[in-house]
Amino acid sequence: MKAIKLFAIAALTLGMMACNKKEDSNVIPNEGTQATLSIKVDAGSQLRALGASPADGDVKSLEVYVYAGDLLEGYKKVENTSEAVDINVTTGERKLVVVANANLGKINSLTELQEIALRDKVVMVEPSGDDQVGVVMTAEPQTITIKAGKNTYGFGAGEGSISSAPLQLVKVPARISLVGASTSFEGAFAGWTFEPSEVFVFNVPNSSRLFGPSLELVEMGRYAGMKQDSWTGDLWVPSQVVKEVLRDEVSDLSSITPNNFIYYHSFESIGKPVVLVIRGKLKDDSGQLVKGAPFADDNGYTHYSILVNAERSGYAYTGDDTGTGNLKRNTDYRISVVIKRPGTSDPTTPPADAATLDVKVAVTPWLTVNQNIEY
C-alpha cells in the first residue's frame, strides 16, 4: 500500500486564479466604519485518530472571503494554519465564505465564487511541485454582521465574538475505504483459495462543484484504476481515463485492517455506481489455477466487484443515506468483505449469485458508512 496516496480531485476552471503565498486586502472600499475579522475553522474528522488514516483533514491553505452583497470586500489567504486573523472589512451585514486547499485566489464576485467547479487533475495529499495539495473543503456562505472594532469567529466568547465555535468545514469529495477482506470458501468451493494481486476502483467522477445542495456536474468524465479491452459489462462507463493512482498492489488480504486500510477519493456520484474491485487468482481445492469464464479470465484472474453504497443482496449497512448507489461529499464508505465463492472474469459484470460476496459498509461524518459484504 502506498504511504502517500494520490487521488483524483480536480483543477479549477477559472483562468484568473493566481495564488500568492500571502494575500490580504480591502478589495472594495466602503463608507462604513473600518473593522477587522479573525476566523478559526474546524476541519476535524472522527477518523483521524486511526493509525493509517490519511492526512485528508489537514488544512494546507485557507482562504477567507467577505462579501458586501455580491462584491468582495475582504480577502486573506494563509497556509498551514486553521486561523486567519485581522482581515480588513467594514461594518454591516456581510457574507462569509471559507475554502481550504483550493488555492482560488481573489474572486471579486460571490456569484462567481459559488459557480466554481473543480475539474480533471490528479492531486497529492503531500506536496509535489506545483500540484494542488490536500482535500478541498468548504463552508457554505454564512451571513454575519460586522461591528466596529475587532470581530472574531471561532475564538470563544467575548467582546466582538460572532460565534464562539469554529466554522465547520466539510470535505468536497467522499472517501472509499477498504478496511477488511477475508476468504471463507464454502459449499462446492470449499478448499478453494484466492491470491490477491491488486485493488482498484472505476467509474470515479473527475469533476465537482464547490458549493450547493448537489455537487455533481452534468458534464464530467470518469476515472479508472485499470482497464482491459475485454471488459464489456453494464457497470462500465465509456471513455474512462486510466489513473494508476486509483490502483494498489495487494498480496495479502490480512494486511488490510481498520488501522491499515486502502482508500480512494471520489467526487459526488449520482446514478452510476462507483465500483471497487479486488483482483487476483483462484485455485481450486487441488491447487490448480482456475482459468476461463465465468470465474476467471484466460490469464487466471478473477474479480470481486463491490458497488459502493448500492443496494444488493449480501450487502449490509450501518449509517445514514445508505444503499442508494450514490456517493455524497464528506462521507467515508468503510467496506469490509468476506469472499465465499469465485468472482468473475469481467469486473464490469458482477455475479448474479448473492452468496458470492458478503459486504458490510459503515457511513459517518467524515460521515461514515460501513458496508459489509459476503461474496
PLM regions with names:
Residues 27-33, 162-167:
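Beta-strand-rich domain onsets/edges
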Residues 15-18:
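C-terminal motif of bacterial Sec signal peptides marking the signal peptidase cleavage site
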Residues 120-171, 307-375:
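Extracellular beta-sheet/turn segments enriched in Thr/Pro/Gly and aliphatic residues
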Residues 31-37, 174, 274:
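Short structural boundary motif marking the start of a folded domain
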Residues 20-23:
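Bacterial signal peptide processing site
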Residues 50-112, 175, 179, 183-329, ...:
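Tryptophan-paired
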Residues 35-43, 176-183:
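A short, amphipathic beta-strand motif
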Residues 1-7:
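Bacterial N-terminal signal peptides that target proteins for export
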